Structures are given as structure tokens and as C-alpha cells.
């Protein structure tokens, strides 16, 4: 059963039984104290969730403490000798608990009542926090266990003041007196025998940490009442009140305690039965130790005193009986991280951790031991599964091209992979083709060499292991190799294997394929392909040692989006979103079924046949768990391939030979229609910076990430982040063949940081692939305002100069101001940008060096007149108002604009409307201003009817004659504001 619902951490089927026993006991106790409650085990929480009964009981305990102190004072007992007297002090100091008797269930008044009770428990009774509960635990039924444990503790404290106690508390006090009597009789030397709270319970007492902590002999905390009420009240006339007036209810068919214990112990299936020796009535010695446990019957439950609390004997045996412990609480041998690769995964991006799967290797459950393979000697047509406790999983036959005949063979995955993977030789004379369904690669490994050669297309070089990491991996591998006892089984997407004896059959690894210590081949018979296909170890509830991180077992009806979280699809969705910004992956994972992806990969392998012939040593890496040294062992092969491709990798940098890379990519585009994935490992830091750039694209490379494709000369689709789901190689031929790599910039060989002139992102943060481009504005649909110098060019919406972006220079430093290739945005704050034109720079320098306003005005006048004269001589007589607001490529302003600025400065801002250079212009829309800005940056504006557009873009003062005479400063033109 899939672990979708919230479950307690304890993995055993009997783990809730002790709570049921406690609930029954507390319900009977409260029903005796408060008959008007009509409480029983079924409506236990419903009767208490208003908090009224709890607050009443708190006041009842306070009254009992008052009576207790009065009795002690009447007998002239010392108030300091008793621990219980010390407990009574804080209770009396607090006063009564206030509550609203008419509170309804679920209301805030009920919450207030419950909160007052919890505060009273904490401050008056000094109950430790681990035994308290929260308001929601009772109101919302979030944690019934804590409510029960807290009420048991309250009952213990009340029993010290002479109140009626539940049966469990009475039995606790009886056991404590029995232990104290034994110690008095035998002396302190006997204490070495101890009780049930010894080392056996130190690691497992979390299953039954229900009450306070006791020592191995006499309780030495708040319950050490050797001279307290239970001895002093022995002479009272009603001692029964201490231990409850109710006799024990017999619901066990009059079986004695010993018979019930014997019945439970007899369920042991060990070769030699788990010993439980009766010492005296209710006292047993457990196992082969000297540990004594105290057993009592509580209605139909056999209870064991554990660590200051109670557990059921069946649950206790589940934890300590070796056969039950192994059957239901399987110990973890080792853990392994399996990166789950999607078919269109670009391996140079590193390991995709968002879909990685953690596999805890442990012994198989009892359910799996039933299905032992009857034949350990497989014929030549099939593999063999031999070894104790191994499931024979039937294997579907495969065709020669690698297509599996079983459509569901890739869906079911074993959760008990081997700690030891044995790859076998593929015999050349066998002629068999081994196909791993659910994975896309084939493994060919020489076991004698022990090296796993990885192809460059799947090697993960972006995560360089440290020497310490390599040492740890070697230690772990040696420890795993030494673990040879017990069955082994491959993971779900395991590598396919063939028999080492040259069998001619075809083996396919499907689901949980098991191999014994001999490790020879693939298990099962081909006849019953679906017989054991969906076997998983969910028959035993999984413990809390991290197994829940495996997620849901894949089945035909349920498919989890992600296997990395415990049970939440929200985690999967959020991680899918986080994948867009993670530094490990830039290609979105494919969510297609495994069998479809396998088919497509096999088609790609058919298309790439000539590559396989040309390079015989192109071994592939399986999708299964890989140890890092095994991958790194093929480093010399990888470096040879990288150097052939023009990529030279050292410890400090990655150098790309552009000429070689271009030749290689052109040859690939011409000879092979399938675009190869990148073989250049990329630094996560560079990717993070690259994605932090606010986006804008310009034409080229089909609108893909030009800063990546132009640098390495690789086809653009290999780098697009929002790549469509990989369907088939043949459908991608057109885009792959038509994409031409853009010539890279010259001085970009040893860096991966995006340059200012290479940034090709979009405004909204997405990358625009070739199919998503907007239709360009051509000459017949858009008339650009020109200055009459060049031929008409097409309008480019996503030019480099039209976005606000965070840019980095070749040293990795952030470029603050607009560079020559990229101006500032129209919408960015002018305060945050440095001036980018020479005139503005000189004006700022002049203003900073001047002492007062007069000097500033003088310097500005001289600068402006100098620039005006220079521009007039350059522009000549033919300069008209057409290019009034144009900025030339050298950043200087045109004469019309200079006249306006000069007049404004000379007149100290008191510029008359008649002196304006143009009639009032309408406010430009965003589209027109963006168009003119883009055209001003691309200095290829053609001749045309640009006079109207040019004159319309000169900004005049915005008020009428009778209004303010000071014009609004125009930051687009001056760039000073």
C-alpha cells in the first residue's frame, strides 16, 4: 500500500495497540470520576474537546492537594520531607482554572478552555514538555497520543494526593513497590539485574515513551514517595481509594497471564524460540539477558512496563524477537543516490537532483522470500536467478532492435537494489542484445578490469570530486563489496546483463531483477511475464529510517511527479518550478513514460549508427546507481574526445578552440541531421549568472540563447531551457538541420561569463525559441523615422539596446552603466544609472569641479557652445528638424536639440514658448517611443518620410502661456536626470 496517508513513525502493525489500551483505561477512569460525562473509548476525544471536563478535573486535583496537605498537617507531618508536599505548593499557588462551561466543540471558547488546562499542567504540575499536548492535538485531533500521555501523567500526580487512579497507574505503583521490596530484601547488590529499562530499551524506547523516565531500580524523581501517602495512608480506613475500587475486568476467556504470554511468544519463527522465562507472577526474563520485564493484563491487552510507560507485549516482541524484527523492521545496509535522467537531459548540466532517488539497500521482506526461484540453473535462452530469498521476476522477451514486448515492463521498480552490481561480459559470439527497459542505455563492462567507461555524452564532469569525496566513495564501495550475505537485486532502471557463459538468449532487466552472490544473469521465465511484476515490499510497513523519502511505488494506477519527497505532490511541483533556476539543470525533465522515451532513444541510436562505427569505444553509462570512481575511470577517453572537439579542460579553466568547434559543429550539421548534445561541461556559477541577466533577445541563432550557442558553435536547441517534450528524433530533424550556429566573438575563449554584447535574453525572463518568435515589422508594415542616410532596414523588436539588464564584463564584474552596445532602458530609474554620453560626462565633471552656481553655468555654457559648434560643422547646412531627438552613434546631440538646451541654459530656465523649436508634440505611446529608441540604436534607418515622426518626437514645454514658464526636464534627451 502506498504511503500517501499520514502515519506514525513506528513501523509495526501492533504499534497503535498500546494507545487503544490506554484510551480504554482512561475512559473508564474518567467515567468513574465523572459519570455525567458518559465517556468511553469510542467517544473519548469528543467528550474532552470542549476543555470543560479537563478544567473541572484540574480543579478537582487542586482540591485533592488541599485535602492532602490538611491531612499531613493534622498528623503533624513535616511539610518538607515529602516530595508530594512539594508538588502541592505550586498547585495551591496557582488557584483554580477558569473555564467557560457552555463552550461548544470547535469554538474559540473551547480552545481557550483547553489552553488554560495546558497552562495549568505546565505551571502547576510542572509536567515536562514532551508529555504535554497542544490545543490542536485535541481540538483538531492532530495528535491523540500526546493527549493520552498527558492525561496519564495528570492521573499519576492526582493519585499522589489520594485521588482515584487509572488501572495502569495502579499497576505502576504496584510494580514500583515490588521493586523496592526486592531491593530491601536482597540488598543493593541485586540492583545489577535491573528491570526492563536497560540497554535493550535505549534505542527503541521511542515506540513507547509514554510517561516519565525511571531508573533501572527505584524511581528517584517525583515519584519517590517511600515515606509518603501510600505508606502513611495504609492505616486509613479507605486505602482502596488509592488504587481504585474497580476490580480488574476479565475479558480474556479466563486465561491466566502466563497463558496469554505463552501464546504471544509461541508466534516466534526463529530456529530456536525467543526465550521469555517466567520468574514470578507477572515478572519475566526476556531473551538471553538478565533483563526483567513486568507484565500485566489490562482487559484484553497484555501490557509490559517499559521505560516509565507501557507497551503491549506483542509490540514489544515485534521489536526484540529477531524473526519479527527482521520481518517488519528491515535494517538499512547502505544508501545510494540514483540520478534519474530524462531522455532529453543534457549531461553537461550535471546531475539532476530534483528527480534523484534515494535507495536504501536492505534485506528483502518476508513477502519476497516466499517466491524463491525453483531453478537456479537457467537455460541458454534466459538468465538465472539463484541465491537465498530471491524473487524470480519474469522477463519479457525483447526484439533485436531493443524494443520490449512488454508495455509495462519499465513501470515497476524494485526498492531493494543490490549493494554490489556485477556487470558481465557481453560475448561477441553470443549475438544477444541486452536491453534495459526503463533505461535508455546498454552497458558493456569488463569485470576483470573493474572499470566503467563512460561516454562523453553522459559523463558528469561539472561535479569534480574532492580527494576526500573519492576516499569516502572507495571506502563505501569496499564496504558494499564485502557485503555478500543475503540476496541481491538490481534497481528498477537497472542495466541489462547477459550471461558470462556466452548464452545466445536475450536478457531484459524489468522491475526488480535479482541476482545472487554469483551474480549471473537475468531472472525468471519468459512465459509468465506479469506474474511477479508488481511485487513490492509494502507488505511490511516501512520504518522511519528515511525510507519514506523513496516516495510512492510506481504502479499502473499511480504515477508520482517526483520521488524525492515523502508524499507530497506540492513538493514535486515546487521543485519543478525551482528547476528553472537551479544551477544543476537547464533542460526541463521529460514527463513521458519510460517506454516511449526508450523507443525514441533507440530510434536515435539507429540514426547515429555511423557515429558508433566511427568510434568503437563509445561506451554508455547506465541510468542505474553509479559510483563516482567508476564514472571517473573513463576520464582519458573523455579528454581525448574533448580535445578532438576543440575543448581543452584543465583544473582552472575550460578552453574552447573555436575553429575546431565550428568545424565539428558544421560537420555534424552537414553529415548527421540529429543535433548532438553539448560535450562542454558548464560551470554552475556561470549558469547562475547567465540566468540572473534580465532577458532580451536580438535576431540570430533562431532567437535562442546566443551567448551559449555562439560561444561553442553548437546548435541552439541544445541550450534552450524550455525545450519541448522530446518525442522523436525524426520530428526534430528540420529544426536541427536548419539551425546555423552564430559566429562567436573573438576574445571569448577562456571565459563563460556573458559579455555585454552577447546578451540575448527576453524581457519577461523566458528564452524565445525559433517557433515562438513574433513576426517582424517589415518595411511594408512599419515606416521607420530616418535621418536620410542609409537604406531602409527591417525593424528588430528585441534589439540589444532595448532592455534593462544586469551585465557582466569579461572579468565577471557587473556592468553598471549602459555600454556602447547596449543603452539604458527607458523605464529604469535615471538616478541609478551613470551617465553614458560624453557630453553628460563632461557636464557632470564640470559641475563637480565648480565652486558655485556661477562657475557651473559658465562651464556649462562653454561646453554647450563647443558641442553646438562642432555638431553644426559636422551636420552641415542640410541638417533639419527631422533628426531633432536623434542621438548619433558617437552619443552627441543634434543641433536643434543643442539650440533648445543652450537657450534654456542662457535664459536661466525662463524660456518663452516662442523660442521653442517645434510645435507642441503629442505624448508618445510606449510603442512609438520604443520603436524610435530601437531605431536610434540600430544606425541603419533608411530614407523615408521621417520628417513628421522626427518633429513629433521633439518635446516642448508642457504648459500653456499663462502657466509655469519652467519646462519639464526631459531625461531621455539630456540623460542628466
UniProtKB/Swiss-Prot annotation:
Essential for development and viability. Required for ovary development and oogenesis, and is essential for the development of the indirect flight muscles. May act as a negative regulator of the Notch signaling pathway in certain tissues, such as the muscle precursors and ovaries. May function as a linker protein between the actin and microtubule cytoskeletons. InterPro entries: CH_dom, CH_dom_sf, GAR_dom, GAR_dom_sf. Residues 502-527 have a biased composition (Gly residues). Its main location: cytoplasm. Pfam families: CH, GAS2. Residues 221-236, 601-620 have a biased composition (Acidic residues). It comes from the Eukaryota. Residues 928-953 have a biased composition (Low complexity). Residues 218-245, 397-543, 557-624, 666-685, 693-803, 910-977 are annotated as: Disordered. Expressed in the ovary and the ring canals of the germline cells. In larvae, expressed in the notal region of the wing disk. The keyword Secreted does not apply. It is found in: Cytoplasm, Cytoskeleton; Cytoplasm, Cell cortex. Named 'Picked eggs' based upon the mutant ovary phenotype. GO terms for cellular component: cell cortex; cytoplasm; cytoskeleton. GO terms for biological process: actin crosslink formation; attachment of GPI anchor to protein; follicle cell of egg chamber development; follicle cell of egg chamber stalk formation; microtubule bundle formation; negative regulation of Notch signaling pathway; protein localization to microtubule plus-end; regulation of microtubule polymerization or depolymerization. Belongs to the GAS2 family. This is GAS2-like protein pickled eggs. Residues 20-159 form the Calponin-homology (CH) domain. Residues 252-324 form the GAR domain. Residues 399-428, 436-454, 577-589, 666-677, 731-741 have a biased composition (Polar residues). GO terms for molecular function: actin filament binding; microtubule binding. Keywords: Cytoplasm, Cytoskeleton.
Amino acid at each position: 500500500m502506498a504511503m500517501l496517508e499520514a502515519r506514525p513513525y513506528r513501523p509495526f502493525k501492533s504499534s497503535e495497540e498500546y494507545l487503544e489500551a490506554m484510551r480504554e483505561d482512561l475512559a473508564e477512569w474518567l467515567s468513574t470520576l465523572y459519570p455525567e460525562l458518559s465517556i468511553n473509548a469510542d467517544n473519548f476525544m469528543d467528550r474532552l474537546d470542549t476543555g470543560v471536563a479537563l478544567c473541572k478535573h484540574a480543579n478537582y486535583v487542586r482540591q485533592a492537594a488541599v485535602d492532602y496537605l490538611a491531612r499531613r498537617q493534622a498528623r503533624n507531618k513535616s511539610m518538607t520531607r515529602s516530595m508530594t508536599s512539594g508538588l502541592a505548593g505550586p498547585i495551591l499557588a496557582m488557584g483554580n482554572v477558569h473555564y467557560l462551561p457552555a463552550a461548544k466543540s470547535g469554538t474559540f471558547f473551547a480552545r481557550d478552555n483547553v489552553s488554560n488546562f495546558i497552562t495549568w499542567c505546565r505551571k502547576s504540575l510542572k509536567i515536562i514538555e514532551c508529555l504535554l499536548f497542544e490545543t490542536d492535538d485535541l481540538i483538531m485531533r492532530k495528535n491523540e497520543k500526546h493527549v493520552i500521555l498527558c492525561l496519564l501523567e495528570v492521573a499519576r500526580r492526582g493519585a499522589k494526593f489520594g485521588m482515584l487512579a487509572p488501572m495502569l497507574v495502579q499497576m505502576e505503583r504496584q510494580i514500583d513497590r515490588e521493586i523496592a521490596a526486592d531491593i530491601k530484601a536482597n540488598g543493593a547488590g541485586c540492583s545489577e539485574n535491573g528491570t526492563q529499562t536497560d540497554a535493550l530499551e535505549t534505542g527503541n524506547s521511542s515506540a513507547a515513551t509514554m510517561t516519565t523516565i525511571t531508573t533501572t531500580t527505584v524511581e528517584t524523581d517525583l515519584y519517590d514517595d517511600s515515606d509518603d501517602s501510600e505508606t502513611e495512608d495504609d492505616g486509613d480506613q479507605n486505602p482502596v481509594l488509592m488504587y481504585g475500587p474497580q476490580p480488574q475486568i476479565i475479558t480474556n476467556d479466563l486465561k491466566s497471564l502466563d497463558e496469554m504470554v505463552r501464546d504471544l511468544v509461541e508466534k516466534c519463527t526463529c530456529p530456536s524460540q525467543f526465550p521469555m522465562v517466567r520468574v514470578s507472577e507477572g515478572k519475566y526474563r526476556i531473551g538471553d539477558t538478565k533483563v526483567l520485564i513486568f507484565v500485566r493484563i489490562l482487559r484484553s491487552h497484555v501490557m509490559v512496563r517499559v521505560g516509565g510507560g507501557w507497551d503491549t507485549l506483542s509490540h514489544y516482541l515485534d521489536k526484540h524477537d529477531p524473526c519479527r524484527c527482521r520481518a517488519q523492521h528491515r535494517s538499512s545496509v547502505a544508501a545510494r543516490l540514483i540520478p534519474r535522467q530524462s531522455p532529453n537531459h543534457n549531461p553537461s548540466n550535471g546531475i539532476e537532483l530534483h528527480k534523484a532517488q534515494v535507495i536504501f539497500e536492505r534485506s528483502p521482506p518476508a513477502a519476497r522470500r516466499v517466491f524463491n526461484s525453483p531453478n537456479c540453473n537457467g537455460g541458454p535462452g534466459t538468465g538465472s536467478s539463484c541465491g537465498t530469498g530471491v524473487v524470480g521476476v519474469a522477463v519479457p522477451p525483447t526484439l533485436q532492435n531493443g524494443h520490449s514486448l512488454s508495455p509495462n515492463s519499465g513501470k515497476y521498480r524494485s526498492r531493494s537494489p543490490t549493494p554490489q552490481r556485477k556487470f558481465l561480459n557481453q560475448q561477441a559470439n553470443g549475438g544477444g542484445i541486452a536491453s534495459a527497459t526503463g533505461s535508455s542505455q546498454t552497458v558493456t563492462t569488463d569485470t576483470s578490469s573493474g572499470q566503467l567507461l563512460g561516454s562523453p555524452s553522459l559523463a558528469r564532469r561539472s561535479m569534480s570530486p574532492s580527494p576526500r569525496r573519492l576516499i569516502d566513495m572507495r571506502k563505501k564501495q569496499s564496504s558494499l563489496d564485502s557485503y555478500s550475505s543475503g540476496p541481491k537485486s538490481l534497481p528498477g532502471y537497472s542495466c541489462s546483463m547477459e550471461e558470462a557463459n556466452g548464452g545466445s538468449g536475450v536478457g531484459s532487466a524489468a522491475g526488480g531483477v535479482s541476482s545472487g552472490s554469483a551474480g549471473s544473469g537475468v531472472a525468471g521465465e519468459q512465459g509468465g511475464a506479469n506474474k511477479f511484476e508488481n511485487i513490492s515490499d509494502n507488505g511490511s510497513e516501512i520504518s522511519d529510517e528515511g525510507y519514506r523519502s523513496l516516495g510512492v511505488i510506481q504502479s499502473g494506477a499511480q504515477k508520482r511527479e517526483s520521488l524525492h519527497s515523502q508524499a507530497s505532490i506540492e513538493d514535486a511541483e515546487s521543485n519543478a518550478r525551482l528547476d528553472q533556476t537551479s544551477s544543476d539543470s537547464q533542460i526541463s525533465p521529460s514527463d513521458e513514460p519510460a517506454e516511449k522515451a526508450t523507443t525514441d532513444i533507440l530510434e536515435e541510436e539507429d540514426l547515429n549508427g555511423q557515429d558508433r562505427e566511427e568510434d568503437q569505444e563509445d561506451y554508455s553509462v547506465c541510468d542505474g546507481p553509479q559510483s563516482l570512481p567508476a564514472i571517473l575511470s573513463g576520464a582519458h577517453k573523455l579528454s581525448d574526445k574533448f580535445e578532438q572537439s576543440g575543448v581543452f579542460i584543465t583544473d582552472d579553466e575550460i578552453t574552447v578552440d573555436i575553429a575546431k568547434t565550428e568545424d565539428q559543429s558544421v560537420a555534424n550539421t552537414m553529415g548527421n541531421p540529429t543535433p548532438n548534445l553539448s560535450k562542454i561541461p558548464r560551470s554552475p556559477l556561470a549558469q547562475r549568472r547567465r540566468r540572473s541577466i534580465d532577458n532580451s533577445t536580438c535576431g540570430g541563432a533562431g532567437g535562442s540563447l546566443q551567448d551559449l550557442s555562439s560561444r561553442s558553435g553548437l546548435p541552439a536547441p541544445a541550450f534552450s531551457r524550455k525545450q519541448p517534450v522530446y518525442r522523436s528524433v525524426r520530428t526534430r530533424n528540420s529544426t536541427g538541420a536548419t539551425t546555423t550556429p552564430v559566429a562567436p566573438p573573438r576574445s571569448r575563449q577562456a571565459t563563460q561569463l556573458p559579455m555585454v554584447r552577447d546578451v540575448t535574453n527576453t524581457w519577461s525572463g523566458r528564452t524565445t525559441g525559433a517557433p515562438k518568435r513574433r513576426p517582424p515589422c517589415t518595411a511594408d508594415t512599419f515606416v521607420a523615422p530616418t535621418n536620410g542616410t542609409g537604406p531602409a532596414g527591417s525593424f528588430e523588436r528585441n534589439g540589444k539596446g532595448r532592455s534593462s539588464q544586469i551585465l557582466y564584463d569579461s572579468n565577471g564584474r557587473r556592468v553598471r552603466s549602459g555600454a556602447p552596445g547596449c543603452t539604458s532602458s527607458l523605464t529604469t530609474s535615471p538616478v541609478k544609472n551613470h551617465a553614458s554620453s560624453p557630453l553628460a560626462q563632461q557636464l557632470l565633471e564640470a559641475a563637480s569641479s565648480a565652486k558655485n552656481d556661477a562657475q557651473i553655468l559658465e562651464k556649462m555654457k562653454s561646453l554647450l557652445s563647443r558641442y553646438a559648434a562642432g555638431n553644426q560643422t559636422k551636420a552641415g547646412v542640410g541638417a533639419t528638424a527631422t533628426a531633432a531627438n536623434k542621438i548619433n552613434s558617437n552619443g552627441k546631440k543634434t543641433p536643434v536639440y543643442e539650440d533648445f538646451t543652450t537657450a534654456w541654459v542662457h535664459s536661466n530656465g525662463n524660456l518663452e514658448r516662442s523660442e521653442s523649436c517645434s510645435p507642441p508634440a503629442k505624448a508618445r505611446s510606449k510603442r512609438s517611443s520604443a520603436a524610435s529608441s530601437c531605431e536610434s540604436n540600430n544606425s541603419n534607418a533608411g530614407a523615408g518620410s521621417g520628417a513628421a515622426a522626427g518633429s513629433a518626437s521633439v518635446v516642448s514645454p508642457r504648459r500653456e502661456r499663462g502657466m509655469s514658464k519652467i519646462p519639464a526636464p526631459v531625461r531621455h534627451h539630456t540623460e542628466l536626470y
